[in-house]
Amino acid sequence: VAAGFGVPEREARAARPGTLPAGTIPGKIPGMRRHLRPLRAAAPVALPLLAALAAAACVQPPRLVVSDADRVLATTTLDAPNPGLPGPHRVAHFVYGSGTDRRRAVFRDSVAVRTRPVNGTPFLRGIDAKALKARWRYWGFDATALPRNGRVWHPDTAGSFPLVLIVHGNHNMKEFSDPGYEWIGRHLASHGYIAVSVDENFLNGAIRSENDARGWMLLQHLALWRAWAADPAFPLAGRVDTARIALMGHSRGGEAITVAAAFNRLSHWPDDARIPFAFGFGIRALVAIAPVDGQYQPADRLPPVRGVSYFVMHGSHDADVSSFNGQRTYLRATVSDPGTVKASLYVYRANHGQWNTVWGDNDVGPMGRWLAKRSLLSGEEQRQVGRVFFTGFLALTVRGDARYAPMFRDYRTVGGWLPRTQYASQHADGGERAVATYEEDIDVATATAGGAIRAHGLTQWREGMLPMRGAGRASFETNVAYLGWKAPGGDSVSAPRDTAWYEVALPAGALGDS
């Protein structure tokens, strides 16, 4: 356990001018040892591993990174079909929606199934009235008549297929985001899923405090699908498996899916219990792509993630959601229910927008013209990472195909299927036991599992909250240990053990062994 791509900025500033914080254990994050070896500095290091990865993407431009991807990703040991390749099913497509859309002909003239709007007024009450008025003037409807529009890709074959809803995040509301997930919608359909890109563009633009509305709208779409599954006149009658549902969300949509999953288990809206809930859909898995976290806090708490499997992916070069917000969601997700797992993947050189083909490589609006984009993965490379891991995760958690479990424990098991860059992964399935969470007390010498923590020769040793990057200085809501050491020869990474050490001494049987 040690640092990865970087450590919190305030710790980095504590190092000597012109140096980078360093420290890693070989084999934990392939390539990071070579990245850090030339550095000469006292080295503050944040523990545990993935929490440190979450704190920073890369502390310097990529010219300082020596990639070992050709070696690390040279083999594939997973004994299962490559989920990143097209599946065996032919894909068909249709659109459902209001049939009255003022701005998009596809939801006006091309809908195969017409839908009724829903009244979302309670979920938008906290938003500036003037901003909403201008918005509704553009769209031609208001909060009392929010449309349920969706683009559907499905297997053009007989059978019963799981349902996957995909929802975009915030963007210019006049540059429609929902077409940007056709790449994953078609891919999932070829693998035997009914994939829907949900339109929530009317919630985009310069408004805030709307993420509960985004999540609630997803559940309103699921209500349509539950009714359609029992309707013999529906185009996919008898082919929708509503007991196996997954939600996939990008950016604010990545938080909206956690909100939807939380609302799905509740009997009332937390913000106003006069509004009853009765959802109870068969949501099994959440897939979050560079999500935000904490924009909506029901009962002044972060939305819980319980009773579902959770996967989050984030890019090191994300210039929109610059901190790995989804790592905080990952940390609080529980996997105590049978069959649930959680996993995260951090992708070096991936940005925010290329997961959506409409958004592209410009993460920060007009200012994006000054970004050095040569360091980014190409859009197709970035989306191929998504095809492999999103499809593999749904195979594992929605279909129950255990052959794909190893790729979430260690991404190197599918190295031959991945674009050549660097990755860091984390996984939990309920079988883990915490040795030291640094949250049991304020004593640096105690461990969660009992026993004692001892150290020698450190220049820094303390425990504390792990902050995110950025001006807001939010935290990951988890504690870590900060360690520093200085090697006589200056190479703090490969320093001999007697320079400094840190160990957790556990009592017999602390981990269930004899």
Predicted regions and their residues:
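Active-site-adjacent alpha-helix of alpha/beta-hydrolase-fold enzymes
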Residues: 303-380
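Active-site machinery of serine-nucleophile hydrolases
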Residues: 177-219, 223, 341-344, 348
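Short glycine-enriched nucleophile-adjacent loop
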Residues: 254-266
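Short beta-strand element of the alpha/beta-hydrolase
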Residues: 160-169
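Short conserved active-site loop signatures built around small residues
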Residues: 62-159
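A conserved short beta-strand
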Residues: 268-291
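Gly/Ser-rich "nucleophile elbow"/oxyanion-hole loop immediately N-terminal to the catalytic nucleophile
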Residues: 159, 209-255
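Alpha/beta-hydrolase-fold serine-hydrolase catalytic core, especially in secreted/extracellular enzymes
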Residues: 62-70, 78-79, 349-351, 358-512
